[in-house]
Amino acid sequence: MKKLLLFIAGISILFLAGCSNGNQSHGNEGMGDSLPADPPLGYVIELKPLGNFSHQEAEQLREELVKQLGFIFNKVPKAWVEASVFVGDKKEIPASCLYKPRNRYWAGGILKMLHEEHGGNDEIVTIGLTHRDISTSIHGQYNYGIMGLSFRPGDACVVSTFRLKRKDDLWKVTIHEFLHSRGLPHCKKDAPKCLMQDAHGKNTFYMKHGLCEDCKSSLRMIMTHQETKYQNT
């Protein structure tokens, strides 16, 4: 656990120092693809196909996610990013999660299932992938349709394609929820291109890419705090 958090902190600090919301670099030049001498234990992200979300679709998302994380963490060797994302076994959404009046699945119930599957092993952040409509109670509304939800911080997220106008934006929702799981809140600035902006029920991921300077700073502080905490345990 300590090594994994140090690894996450390391790649986050590199990202915050080296990436910008504008011109993106493939990075990796001159660093090679060799793994660290003491590689992290476990994986950072497990992509979990749910229901009719196919393994092939999950693999396609993984490829895109690895590519985009390569842009974001542009100082990190490609092999590190490759090793941090994998596709897990397919799983069905429990029938108990279904809210029949709106034919939606409670996202909180899905998170509980994903969390319990690994017995609370926080070395793996599991992201459930579904085509079904998912919901939670938020913004003063009961059973509000959403694109994603995660524990913040925590070891489980769920994302849905149901409300996405462009399926190509799924990687953005995935990164948004993953960063929530690391403890990063919604963006508080008027920065429409920031991936951490709250959608507020609107599908605006098509215009989002990267993090604003405030969110970079917040993520740096979160990861530095976690690194210090586990160095002292």
Ranges and model annotations:
Residues 16-18:
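C-terminal motif of bacterial Sec signal peptides marking the signal peptidase cleavage site
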Residues 143-169, 185-233:
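Metalloprotease/metallohydrolase-associated module, dominated by Zn2+-dependent proteases
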Residues 6-11:
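Sec-dependent N-terminal signal peptides
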Residues 1-4:
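Positively charged n-region of N-terminal signal peptides that target proteins for export
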Residues 40-57:
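Fold-level signature of zinc-dependent metallopeptidase catalytic domains
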Residues 55, 59, 63-173, 185:
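Metzincin-family zinc-dependent endopeptidase catalytic domain
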Residues 179, 183-184:
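Active-site-flanking alpha-helical
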Residues 20-22:
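Bacterial signal peptide processing site
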